Amino acid sequence: SAASDVYKRQIHKGRNELRKMEYGGREYVVKSFHRPNIINRFVYGIFRPSKAKRSYDHAELYLKIGVGTPQPVGYFNVRSGLLFDKSYYVSCLSTCPYVYNDLFRRKFDYEEEVLREIGRVTAVLHEHGYAHKDYGRENILFQKTPEGIKLEIVDLNRMFVGTIGMKAGCKNFERLPATPQMHRWMAEEYAKARGFDVEKCFELMVAYRSTQPGKIDNLY
């Protein structure tokens, strides 16, 4: 059967679940979104696109504007009559071996390149009017390649769409822990790409980050 040809391994289980699957010699990630409450089951069943559909649509959009994300494959919604039940989003497995948080776990001799690329890519998103609403330390993947730094952004179901100015743009970095030097590199690249003042962007990023919980060593 087809099921017997699929190798599955759980890689994350929390509010939602991630499983790595191998099929036909290729590796995929399947994200299953938890069943919402009864009111939202009705809303998602009739009026709103599911989180899986939004993830798929946003991934297509990211790739269209040149922002990296694992290649989307598809999504599947499960219903019970008019009520929405669960949804699943499938993408190819990323080849990027590291996440942003790894910058605090080990030393990278190309750390500056990674942070500058994050600043540049975030600017591309904001210039197009898109802001990732879960822009955290586990959702930015990276890899050093002969062509430069490869970034892939994941967990795309929640996204703001609209005009993003300097303050809102710098606030979007607030969930990323960073030393002053790390903020400096991101701010320089972000400001350059958007035509903003570097010092102002740096000050805003530091200020917004200072209000956030989840510090590393109570510092960053």
Language-model features: where?
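C-lobe/activation-segment region of protein kinase-like
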Residues: I149-L219
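ATP-binding glycine-rich loop module of kinase domains
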Residues: E17-A52
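Residue-level recognition of conserved beta-strand positions in structured domain cores
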Residues: S32-H34, K64, G74, L93
